[in-house]
């Protein structure tokens, strides 16, 4: 998450009891989307439909097949960010996870893994072919345009343990959805880390309420979403960046957000802020359609993750980036 300097303000304190009173959702005109409107980029493989339906801060351990699209991004052998599988060659993550000054060869991707200490027979390791950063990254906001497309050198082999997530329709209405986020971030404000993939159910919070909570100096752009469980203090934390925020609709999971920034961990008045996937949908689809696959090589299966014992926390200035 990110820590932006701002005051809560009187309106923020007045709003807090309202958030505790009942579950809060981003609401609009009630409208249901048929299952076919989910955007799949994976060909014949069904997206957003794990075979098994089943810790972030205060979260619970995730089962191996519950979130099969989850990705672990590593830098120099350490987990630094999460991500999600879009198709056999493409992963979606956060732009701030990639430093333009670092060599691409120092990054790699793991899929089919829930414990960072050890791989299993479903774990696959991939080198990165290229990373495409959204052109507005940090242009209008310190962490605005926080979206990255990662193309792999070889194709992911799909199974019950490794599957893509669906992209949402561009006109998706976020109303009464069951939304979850996953990741390997810190599990306590004191910096305690864990190796197990964690999950947390996070209610969506309307942007205008989120803006009041953060104050005017921590401005939110229309491309951003907010989510947190105000009652239980479940939230995203450092190391969760790039991981997906997914919501279930018509028995299919859709990715609506990318973990981006916030203020500390488990701060009851500061929800996690996510890049809104629907806002960037046309950009994502355009690049995945026009860019050819890299020269094909055999996928690399890992027997053990490379030195993946420590969660690496990225800090960008005074913005504590997840």
Swiss-Prot record:
SUPFAM superfamilies (UniProt xref): Trypsin-like serine proteases
PROSITE patterns, alphabetized: TRYPSIN_DOM, TRYPSIN_HIS, TRYPSIN_SER
Keywords: Disulfide bond, Glycoprotein, Hydrolase, Protease, Secreted, Serine protease, Signal
This protein's name: Serine protease 38
Family indicated by similarity: Belongs to the peptidase S1 family.
UniProt keyword annotation of Disulfide bond present: yes
GO biological process, one term: proteolysis
Active site (catalytic residues): 96 (charge relay system), 146 (charge relay system), 241 (charge relay system)
Protein localization: Secreted
Organism of derivation: Mus musculus (Mouse)
EC number: 3.4.21.-
UniProt xrefs under Pfam families: Trypsin
Gene Ontology MF terms in the entry: serine-type endopeptidase activity
Glycosylation sites: 176, 250, 276
Propeptide: 29-55
The keyword Cell wall biogenesis/degradation appears for this protein: no
Disulfide-bond pairs as recorded: 81-97, 179-247, 210-226, 237-265
Signal peptide: 1-28
Domain Peptidase S1: 56-289
GO CC terms: extracellular region
């Amino acid at each position: 998450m990110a820590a932006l300097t701002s005051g809560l303000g009187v309106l923020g304190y007045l709003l807090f009891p309202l958030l505790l009173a009942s579950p809060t959702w981003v609401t609009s005109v009630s409208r249901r989307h048929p299952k076919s409107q989910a955007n799949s980029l994976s060909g014949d493989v069904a997206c957003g439909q794990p075979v098994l339906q089943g810790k972030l801060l205060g979260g619970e351990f995730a089962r191996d097949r519950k979130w099969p699209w989850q990705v672990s991004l590593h830098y120099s052998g350490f987990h630094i960010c999460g991500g999600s599988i879009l198709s056999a060659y493409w992963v979606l993550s956060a732009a701030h996870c990639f430093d333009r000054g670092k060599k691409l060869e120092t990054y790699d991707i793991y899929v089919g893994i829930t414990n960072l200490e050890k791989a299993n027979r479903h774990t696959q390791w991939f080198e990165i072919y290229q990373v495409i950063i959204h052109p507005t990254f940090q242009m209008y906001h310190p962490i605005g345009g926080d979206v990255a497309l990662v193309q792999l050198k070889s194709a992911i082999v799909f199974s019950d343990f490794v599957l893509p997530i669906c992209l949402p329709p561009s006109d998706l209405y976020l109303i009464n959805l069951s939304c979850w986020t996953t990741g390997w971030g810190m599990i306590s404000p004191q910096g305690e880390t864990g190796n197990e993939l964690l999950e947390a159910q996070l209610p969506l919070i309307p942007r205008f309420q989120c803006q009041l909570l953060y104050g005017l100096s921590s401005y939110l752009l229309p491309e951003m979403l907010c989510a947190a469980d105000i009652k239980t203090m479940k939230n995203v934390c450092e190391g969760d960046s790039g991981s997906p925020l997914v919501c279930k609709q018509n028995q299919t999971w859709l990715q609506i957000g990318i973990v981006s920034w916030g203020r500390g961990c488990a701060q009851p008045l500061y929800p996690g802020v996510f890049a809104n996937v629907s806002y960037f949908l046309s950009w994502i689809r355009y690049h995945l359609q026009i860019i050819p696959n890299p020269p094909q090589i055999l996928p690399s299966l890992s027997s053990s993750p490379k030195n993946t014992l420590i969660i690496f926390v990225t800090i960008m200035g005074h913005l504590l980036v997840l």
